Amino acid sequence: MSRLDVTFKTLDGLTLSGWLYPAAQYGPGIIVSPGFNMPREAFVPDIAQWYQNHGITALIFDTRTYGLSDGQPRQETSARKRVEDFHDAVTFLSKHELVDPEKIALWGLCFDGNMCLAATALDPRVHAVVAVAPVIDLHGFPERRRAILELAMQDREAQMAGEEPIYLPYVNEDGTVPLGPSMGSDFWPMMTRLKIPVENRVTVQTFYSAFSWDIMTLIPYVSPTPAMMVTPENDIECPAAEQIAAFEKMGEPKTFHLLPGKGHLDWAFGDVDSVMEKQLEFLKGALNF
């Protein structure tokens, strides 16, 4: 089936770029997003196409400062602004001729699982949410916080004096990251193998923003929107125990799907259909289609 290049505006005037996967008939829509520092090419095109093939019009897009979307500095994430980008994506998708605006869902992986839960808590137009391996705690290892905050304040002063933003690596060659748990030594080989064009840099202000974000304060407000959490049992990058604690704090209606023996990303390789069928079952019940 076809994929269309699309653009849409944000409330503050940026143009965001994405791909639309139109279903064969009028019905539900879903916005699918791949996670922190990832372009739209990462992981989710196959997910979007799967939903398209099962009667759901799917949208994936580059959030601000990433890929082909507007925004400066490049590779900078403000959690609050990223959530607002999801609101504006809902506005765009709700006006499409194939989409029933009363049947729009969000789907987020890792960091964007967090963002989609937040967007759902704040946007009554969202009628279901699927959070896959969502990162819950953005505060990182305590022993690293002060050094990063000191660098962030140096960066603010330098930018005020006309200097370029300071960047940190997204993931080091050995798989370690600035804030916390390692992504594993196979991270970059996997990105190369999958031909995902990831820029290995993130502004230090991104981490400053992350330190002030706490999804647990919003989790209770996801309800009454139906929510599904998909948790890989052996997730180390986004610890399964933290995901379960967030799920337990949610109100009803909610659905939990544990992926036995799976890690943060390896669930996407192998029997993906069985994972997706559970999500489709949830969405059919939540969106009534």
From Swiss-Prot:
Phenotype on disruption: Impairs the production of fusamarins.
Recorded GO MF terms: hydrolase activity; transferase activity
Gene (UniProt): FMN3
Induction: Expression is induced when NaNO(3) is used as sole nitrogen source. Expression is positively regulated by the cluster-specific transcription factor FMN4.
The keyword Ion transport belongs to this UniProt entry's keyword annotation: no
Catalytic residue positions: C110, D235, H264
Name this protein carries in UniProt: Polyketide transferase FMN3
UniProt keyword Transit peptide present: no
InterPro entries named in the record: AB_hydrolase_fold (IPR029058), Polyketide_trans_af380 (IPR051411), Xaa-Pro-like_dom (IPR000383)
Pathway assigned in UniProt: Secondary metabolite biosynthesis
